[in-house]
């Protein structure tokens, strides 16, 4: 509360800041013979936004929300002129010059339909936008699918990277409010496609008003209600049980222009994959074999099972999602207000290993995520050229994962029932309860051929939950002083983070105490929080500890294990000078980062409290607030009306991924104990990550309806996190902490060079085309903070060698083409028919051919090299590359008008040719089809000899054909998604 009150106080004291939701109109009004018309009025139709021209006929209209408008210029004695289809983009200037014709009759008017701008003369960096029309026509109906088409953007294993960056170096906003997942990277919200006015990608080089993003910003801007009521109802259905119902409505309500979109989606399989059906029939008689089960793979247990897998229908992967996106704009002349509200609630079932879980799908995990965002912005014009603005936003994200059989628990005691055989029997069935070895000991799996298949009723998940809150406050001013747009602002953000996990082993121990200990009278007693025996057991078996919760799942706000509350405060000043032949955008930004982590008072002697399973808190203090100064400079040179050059230099800074340094005191005790390998340790007093970037580019409109953009860039990022030892820690330090305990430290870097090419056309003979190509060379020491775990382990207390190599998440070559073909309104039966084709290609990502032994792995897992400590590179790191990937998406739609109502029928196909794209490979073989285990005698000979054809048959079907061992180890797949067909209809009014 103390921090919150400080933020609110600052909010009312300071008058600086800006949110990225609007652009501006700028131009001149002159007569047809070129004479400047002073005092002409320029109005954005349907709004109170407008300006009068100065003595040179020039005007500027600030703070125009992104979208499409009609703009009218009027002057006494001249025909009023209206230009429609005027597109305003966030943070860019829309040039609009009017030439008015003299009029002998009062009230004469001229209407002009504006054309799509192909060159942004005011942009001093690379900005790629997708407007509402392009979003609606696209063959991929997802924000991610549209981002994947943009130059500089790479999506590898579900994570988005911009210009060779790590995923955590990309920021995301929605209607100017931050929606970045600062804990685990990525974005928390994807807006409803029909609610979007535009999506924009800024690949670095932005002005001083943008922070917290070293490599790029992805902006989603919601639509504003129009001057008339209108709406749309849309329904689609498709493969894998997919349904989608979306409705939008917007228009005026008195002084309010509102817009709302509601979307409800359902799918039976939210993660479709290339699975292959199989039956285990070792004797080849055409009948599925009855296979004897063995206790832990050794002793017959008297049970038999049939292994028959249907790869076309995977159980327990249902997902349901409900979204609401709303905006409301109120215009009171010099004062206007915009409100944004977002709700995004999802529930989904998980089944990452459908073959191993085929007999126990009822007990697989289910998860729930609830997200709300509220934002408000107040703008006040002191005069047409002086704008004050203030904004407030808050976002809350809660997540919970639980047992699918029992459902969401109301508390600790409910979760204990998951590990109680009587509760399993009464909730599932008697047979499932009877499978348990004791009332508190879960059953062993069916082992056939050394492959474990879970028995019905076995527990599969613990109880986990986390909660994150983001609070943002900003205020600002914009002053248009002639050709100078001067902006200054203050931006404050605070985050609150809590996480909790109750493991199945802890559940088992508490249930054991209830069943066998005189010190625990009942489940009520166990869940009371006051039973010391239970509290001690939880402390022993929940070694990871909690942040912001106690071990019983109650919120906890005190001490070192309370919630983490990192924050940032930023101040900037920026001057954008726009004259006819040059644009100069220069500014400086100062960021202060408070990580809310700790620092050790004596790094050579960590305060490890061995006896109390924690730390000596007096040996730690709050980390210092870090300050970063970031100058920015961008220039644009419109050499001709068709050619613009731009240059950019800038420094950028951000906090590290916050999930990495945070650890409970109990987990710190575990790491310093040194008995266990802990690949995800903690960090202390970490510094910001900083980037320096240079960019030069040219935009050239080589035809009246076509333009290209070529941009070259280079950047260097320092201070990225990596695993390291505290080399100053001695073997005989006073508290006895392990000298080879790992830590997250600043010390990594990335160097990226590349260029981007884009082609964009207006509609030419029904066809509109967009194409992009990116070449990049991204190198560094590590691709992620844990990449050097093997090196660190093998080099013990000496620093591992620093070798620069290609980063595994990058594509050296990446391209995309979108072709949108539409028949016009006067082409008979074909009127309203349209097609959209997307083609995406990339050259794969780097990997390293490696060898090594099996390590501590079960026979059914093979010898995958998941643990970096057991990998032995057979070539320079990152020397090999996965195969090229190709994706084709196609959409066809037909629109007709029935009595003023628009009806559209549509169908679209993702991965049109059902291409089995290889997105990852086995490190040992370098391909996605054979892991080299069965073919390598030194790895598998003894196992195969002891278990025969059944083992081989299972290994080939479970692992090689269906990648269960790879999913188990890496949590991802070797192949991209299969073909998905969707179709539906929409009605617009």
Language-model features: locations:
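Periplasm-facing N-terminal accessory domains of Gram-negative outer-membrane beta-barrel systems
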Residues: 18-109, 113
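Periplasmic N-terminal accessory/gating domains of Gram-negative outer-membrane beta-barrel systems
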Residues: 79, 84-95, 108-207, 217, ...
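Short loop/turn motifs that connect adjacent beta-strands in outer-membrane beta-barrel proteins
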Residues: 208-210, 225-230, 254-255, 333-334, ...
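Transmembrane beta-barrel wall of Gram-negative outer-membrane proteins
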Residues: 239-350, 366-389, 631
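C-terminal beta-signal and adjacent terminal beta-strands/loops
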Residues: 273, 826-868, 883-887, 895-989
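Signature of Gram-negative outer-membrane beta-barrel scaffolds
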Residues: 311, 315, 460, 487-642, ...
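Membrane-embedded beta-barrel scaffold of Gram-negative outer-membrane proteins
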Residues: 646, 650, 656, 660, ...
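Gram-negative outer-membrane beta-barrel transporters
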Residues: 712-716, 721-847
């Amino acid at each position: 509360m103390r921090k919150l009150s400080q933020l609110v106080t600052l909010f009312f004291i300071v008058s600086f800041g800006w949110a990225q939701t609007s652009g501006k109109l700028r131009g001149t009004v002159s007569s047809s013979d070129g004479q400047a018309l002073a005092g002409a009025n320029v109005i954005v139709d349907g709004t109170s936004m407008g300006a009068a021209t100065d003595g040179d006929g020039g005007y500027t209209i600030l703070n125009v929300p992104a979208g499409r408008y009609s703009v009218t210029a009027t002057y006494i004695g001249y025909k009023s002129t209206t230009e429609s289809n005027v597109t305003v983009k966030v943070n860019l200037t829309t040039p609009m010059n009017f030439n008015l014709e003299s009029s002998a009759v009062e009230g004469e008017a001229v209407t002009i339909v504006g054309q799509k701008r192909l060159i942004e003369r005011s942009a001093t960096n690379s900005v790629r936008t997708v407007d509402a029309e392009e979003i609606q026509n696209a063959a991929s109906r997802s924000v991610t699918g549209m981002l994947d088409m943009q130059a500089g953007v790479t999506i590898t294993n579900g994570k988005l990277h911009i210009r060779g960056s790590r995923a955590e170096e990309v920021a995301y906003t929605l209607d100017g409010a931050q929606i970045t997942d600062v804990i685990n990277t990525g974005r928390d919200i994807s807006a409803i496609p029909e609610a979007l006015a535009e999506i924009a990608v800024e690949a670095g080089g932005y002005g001083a008003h943008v922070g917290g993003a070293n490599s790029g910003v992805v902006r989603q801007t919601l639509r504003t209600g129009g001057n008339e009521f209108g709406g749309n109802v849309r329904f689609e259905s498709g493969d894998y049980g997919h349904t989608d119902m979306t409705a939008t409505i917007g228009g005026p309500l008195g002084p309010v222009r509102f817009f709302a979109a509601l979307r409800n989606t359902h799918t039976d399989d939210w993660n479709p994959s290339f699975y292959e059906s199989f039956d285990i029939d070792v004797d080849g008689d055409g009948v599925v074999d009855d296979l004897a089960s063995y206790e832990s793979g050794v002793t017959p247990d008297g049970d038999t099972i049939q292994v028959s897998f249907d790869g076309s229908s995977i159980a327990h992967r249902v997902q349901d999602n409900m979204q609401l996106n709303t905006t409301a704009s109120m215009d009171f002349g010099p004062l206007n207000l915009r409100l944004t509200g977002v709700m995004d609630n999802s529930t989904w079932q998980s089944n990452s290993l459908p073959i191993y879980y085929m007999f126990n799908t009822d007990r697989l995990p289910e998860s729930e995520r609830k997200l709300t965002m509220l934002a408000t912005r107040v703008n006040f014009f002191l005069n047409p050229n002086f704008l004050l603005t203030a904004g407030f936003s808050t976002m809350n994200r809660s997540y919970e994962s639980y047992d699918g059989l029992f459902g969401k628990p109301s508390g600790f005691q409910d979760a204990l029932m998951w590990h109680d055989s009587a509760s399993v029997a009464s909730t599932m069935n008697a047979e499932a309860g009877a499978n348990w070895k004791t009332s508190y000991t879960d059953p062993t799996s069916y082992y056939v051929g050394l492959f474990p298949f879970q028995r019905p009723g076995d527990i599969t998940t613990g109880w986990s939950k986390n909660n994150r809150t983001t609070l943002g406050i900003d205020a600002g001013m914009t002053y248009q002083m002639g050709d100078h747009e001067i902006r200054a602002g203050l931006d404050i953000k605070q985050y609150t983070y809590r996480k909790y996990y109750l493991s199945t082993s802890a559940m088992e121990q508490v249930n054991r105490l209830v069943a066998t200990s005189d010190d625990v009278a009942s489940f009520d007693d166990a869940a009371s929080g006051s039973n010391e025996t239970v509290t001690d057991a939880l402390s022993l078996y929940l070694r990871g500890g909690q942040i912001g919760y106690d071990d019983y799942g109650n919120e906890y706000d005190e001490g070192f294990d309370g919630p983490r509350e990192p924050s940032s405060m930023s101040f900037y000043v920026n001057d954008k000078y726009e004259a006819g032949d040059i644009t100069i955008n220069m500014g400086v930004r100062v960021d202060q980062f408070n990580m809310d982590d700790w620092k050790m008072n004596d790094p050579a002697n960590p305060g490890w409290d061995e006896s109390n399973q924690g730390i000596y808190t007096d040996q730690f203090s709050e980390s210092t607030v870090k300050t970063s100064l970031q100058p920015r400079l961008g220039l644009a040179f419109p050499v001709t009306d068709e050619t613009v050059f731009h240059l950019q230099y800038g420094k950028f800074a951000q906090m590290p991924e916050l999930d990495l340094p945070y650890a409970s005191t109990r987990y710190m005790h575990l790491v310093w104990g040194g008995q266990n390998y802990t690949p995800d340790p903690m960090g202390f007093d970490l510094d910001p990550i900083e980037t320096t970037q240079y960019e030069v580019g040219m935009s050239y409109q080589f035809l009246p309806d076509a333009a290209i953009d070529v941009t070259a860039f280079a950047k260097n990022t320092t201070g990225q996190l990596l695993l390291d030892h505290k080399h100053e820690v001695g073997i005989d330090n006073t508290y006895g902490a392990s000298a080879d305990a790992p830590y997250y430290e600043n010390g990594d870097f990335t160097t990226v060079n590349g260029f981007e090419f884009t082609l964009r056309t207006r509609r030419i003979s029904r066809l509109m085309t967009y194409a992009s190509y990116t070449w990049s060379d991204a190198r560094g020491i590590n691709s992620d903070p844990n990449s050097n775990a093997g090196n660190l382990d093998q080099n013990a207390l000496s620093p591992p060698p620093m070798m620069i190599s290609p980063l595994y998440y990058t594509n050296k070559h990446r391209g995309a083409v979108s072709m949108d073909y539409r028949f016009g309104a006067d082409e008979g039966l074909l009127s309203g028919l349209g097609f959209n084709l997307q083609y995406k290609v990339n050259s794969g990502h780097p990997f390293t051919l490696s060898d090594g032994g099996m390590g501590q792995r079960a026979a059914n897992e093979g010898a995958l090299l998941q643990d970096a400590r057991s990998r032995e590179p057979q070539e320079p790191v990152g020397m090999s590359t996965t195969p090229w990937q190709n994706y084709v998406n196609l959409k066809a739609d037909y629109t007709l008008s029935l009595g003023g109502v628009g009806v559209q029928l549509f169908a679209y196909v993702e991965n049109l040719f059902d291409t089995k794209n290889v997105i990852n490979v086995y490190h040992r073989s370098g391909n996605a089809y054979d892991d080299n285990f069965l073919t390598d005698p030194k790895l598998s000979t003894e196992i195969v000899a002891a278990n025969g054809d059944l083992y081989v048959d299972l290994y080939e079907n479970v692992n090689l054909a269906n990648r269960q061992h790879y999913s188990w180890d890496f949590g991802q797949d070797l192949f991209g998604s299969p073909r998905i067909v969707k179709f539906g209809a929409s009605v617009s009014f």
